Every structure is written in C-alpha cells, then in structure tokens.
Amino acid sequence: MASTFNPRECKLTKQEGNSYGFFLRIEKDTDGHLVRVIEKGSPAEKAGLQDGDRVLRINGVFVDKEEHMQVVDLVRKSGNSVTLLVLDGDSYEKAMKKQVDLKALGQSQEPSLNDKKAPSVMNGGAQMWMQPRLCYLVKEGGSYGFSLKTVQGKNGVYMTDIKPQGVAMKAGVLADDHLIEVNGENVEDASHEEVVEKVKKSGSRVTFLLVDKETDKHHSEQKIKVKRETASLKLLPCQPRVVEMKKGSNGYGFYLRESPEQKGQIIKDIDPKSPAEKAGLKNNDLVVAVNGKSVESLDHDSVVEMIRKGGDQTSLLVVDKETDNIYKLAGFSPFFYYQSQELPNGSVKEVPAPTPAPLEVSSPETTEEVGDHKPKLCRLARGEDGYGFHLNAVRGQPGSFVKEVQKGGPADLAGLEDEDVIIEVNGVNMLDESYEKVVDRIQSSGKTVTLLVCGKKAYDYFQAKKIPIVSSMADPLDDDPDPDEGRLEGSEQNSHMAEERERAHSTASHSSSNSEDTEM
C-alpha cells in the first residue's frame, strides 16, 4: 500500500539571519503539519516545497505525530540547512483514509548523487559527518530515546525511532546511523540481541561510536574499515582542557599528587591568584599530558621532572573527573584529544570546551539571558463592546502598541497590557506594517483574534540585541475555545485621534486563530 505514495525529499539552505520562506502550521480539522505561504524565489520554493505539503520527517526524524511546537523547534535548531521529507496534500489525505503507515514511506529510497552532502543535525546545528563520531547518552525518564534495528542484506545494527528532543537526538545520534562500538567494544559483527544486551548492561549511561548513513555507504562501497582513531569527539559534553601557565615568583602555585582512588597525577592545593588558578587549573584535575607528551603511564617523579624541564612555562592537558569517566567508558585516552583537535605536540593553545546543546530552548536566539524578556500569545474573543483596548501608533514610525486596556474586558482577560507592542496578528508579523494595516487585519479577523505581543521593556531588549521575536519564544496557548461559545454581538469600530498618535478601538478576529502558524 505504501508504495503507491511517493514522498519527496526537499533540502533547504538559507543565509544566516534569513528565513526559509514558508510557513509551517497546523489547521483545525486538518491532519498533519502543513506547508503554507511559500515565498517566491525563497529556499523553500527552490527546494520544491508546495502549498499543502505535509512534513513527515525532519533530518530523518519522523515527526507526523509530534506536537507542532516540537516540529517547529526541530526546523529552527537545524541551523541554516534542513532536510524535509514531505507528502503532497492529496496523497497525505488518501494515505490517512487508507490507514497507510506513514512512517514507512520513503524509507526504502536510496540517496541520489545530489544527496551525498546532506546536512545532519548536530546539537542544534547542521554538519556533514565524514568520520565516525562519539556520542555520550545519559538516560532521562528511563529512556535513551531511540531503538535499534537490523537492515536486510546489511551487517550490523542501526539506529532508528530517534525521539525528537530526546536524549539520543540531543547527543547527536541520527536516524540510520550504523553502530560501530558500545562503550569502546566493537559490535559490527554482533547480533541485534547481543547489542541490546550490552546497552542494557551499561545502565543509565552509554557511549556509542557511530557513522552516518552516507559515510557508512561510502565505507561499504570502497571496502574501507571504520577506524576508531579517526573518530570525532566534538559531540561529547565534556572535553579535556589545554592549560598554559607561566611560572610566577612562587612557582606555578599548585601541588602534584598521586591519588589512591584514581590512577595518575592529580592537581591539588591551588594557591589563590597563582598562575595555576589564573590559567584555569582546578583542584582534582588529572594530568594527561605535559608539553604535548602523554604522562598517563609515568610515575610521580617522572611527571614532576617533565614539568621542571619546561622551564618558566608549561602546557598541561588535564581532565576533570566527569570528563575522565566519559573517556574511560568510551575506551579512549584523553590524550587522543590532541590528535582530534590537530594540536601539535607541545601546543599551548587554549581550547575551550564545547557547550552542550540547550535542552529546553525553542530557538537559537532564546538563551537564559532572554528568559525574563519573552513575548506572550494572547487569544481574544470579541465581547459586546469589542476587544476592550485601543490600538495606538506614533505618527511617522512603524509599529503599533496597546493602550487603555479595559479592566475585565476580553483584552484584560487574555493578558494584554498597556504599552504591549503588537508583533503578530493571527501568525502574520506586523512590526513593519502601517497602523492602518494592523487595524484592518484585526477588523477583518472575525470572532476571535490571536496576538503575539511584547512588553515595552522586552521589546527594547530584543531590538537592542537584534533578536527576532517569534511565537515559539512565548508560552503556548491552551486548546482553542469554540468561537461561538459565549459570543456577544460586537459594536462598530470607534476611532479616536490624539496629538501625537492615532488609535482605534479594536474589534473582531478570524478563524486563523484555529491554527498555529510559524514562518520558516
């Protein structure tokens, strides 16, 4: 049954700061995540997206049954490149009626020559992997957020059912990844049952060495064996640190000691304001290398002598306990970090540890700093006297804002406040539109209207930081109410004039409030 439906793979690439040129939305009484309002000449149009398409997969992850904002989030976090598997509207509706397994659609498609450089999600960005990569997963809620599968005609075990925003996805695991190692042990020739057992025995944390679908195909065609020494460590949440120090009048300002609990040489008793403290050395750091040479197998006196031979400056490769535990679990020496970073022996280049992907951030711009400055979505149902607020604008300036919110009126009950700046009306950005157009859009809406607004302080903050204000930053609205429930007859719009501004008594709304509409 599934073979009669032909989904399309569309690869979209945009410039930094620009959009993909389409809206992703859900509509009342309509199934699926819909593609709408495709801009002419946009990346969306060039990639072949069509109005009414339903998005089945994003970067290989099946999303048809996921919450809409999670789907929007996946697109946003893909950076400047995203791959969508879509099905045209008519086919989608027929498939739903025939109860076709949408998850199976497109899975047998082999990538074309043009697909060789398809981008893959990596911690919210886009990156093409041509080398194996190491991923570290820690269970959340008793789950890693993936399943394992075997593929007919191919050896090995592969990753599937990657849960959107789950542990595996955040760790950098991709759909159809070939699993090479589990906790440093090669599993290329292991059975499905053996691999499952190894993962279970690992407990609440596990490391995988993986190759993506394209890389795996390349290795298979060229009969190249995957080499663990070529692995990328970039996805690990903790990394070794290269620390450079210049000796002060009282030396470096730390003690080097052997630990009965941990094999190797441990940093202890760092003096305040010493070269060691200023360089970022921490108590209980384990010394892996001195001036580019591994000291993991050396005794205490030998390591001390190597530091002394460095003269008035030294470069240490160190790991904290968490980093050491991750590398040990994966069966890698932290010294491998030198090769992976292409640092020459003896390098004193300071390499900052990468920051793990944010867990609950809805778009790349919404950081913790923005937390107190988020916009809000307000859904207003027209009352007997309209919406209960006035819309104002300063002459000669773009943008409209809220004034005179009537206590107990629809606007007040929806959370609208004086000085709130209107960002969107029913999903359409109105920031650069004239006052008249904003008024007209509200008036032509119907019985309810959904506004994305931003308080003056928050608006000024976003403008200063040049952060675009989008609906995914706001808390989601509850399910739509019945627009006819409790409806009162509306009054005619009442316009007023003030010396410095125009304002209009707001009325009306539109059935578009029965959708979530996000510009991509």
From Swiss-Prot:
A scaffold protein that connects plasma membrane proteins and regulatory components, regulating their surface expression in epithelial cells apical domains. May be involved in the coordination of a diverse range of regulatory processes for ion transport and second messenger cascades. In complex with NHERF1, may cluster proteins that are functionally dependent in a mutual fashion and modulate the trafficking and the activity of the associated membrane proteins. May play a role in the cellular mechanisms associated with multidrug resistance through its interaction with ABCC2 and PDZK1IP1. It is a peripheral membrane protein. The modification Phosphoserine is found at residues 108, 147, 191, 249, 333, 347, 491, 509, 511-513, 515. One of its GO terms (biological process) is protein localization to plasma membrane. The modification Phosphothreonine is found at residue 450. GO terms for cellular component: apical plasma membrane; brush border membrane; plasma membrane. GO terms for molecular function: protein-membrane adaptor activity; signaling receptor binding. It comes from Bos taurus (Bovine). It is found in: Membrane; Cell membrane. This is Na(+)/H(+) exchange regulatory cofactor NHE-RF3.
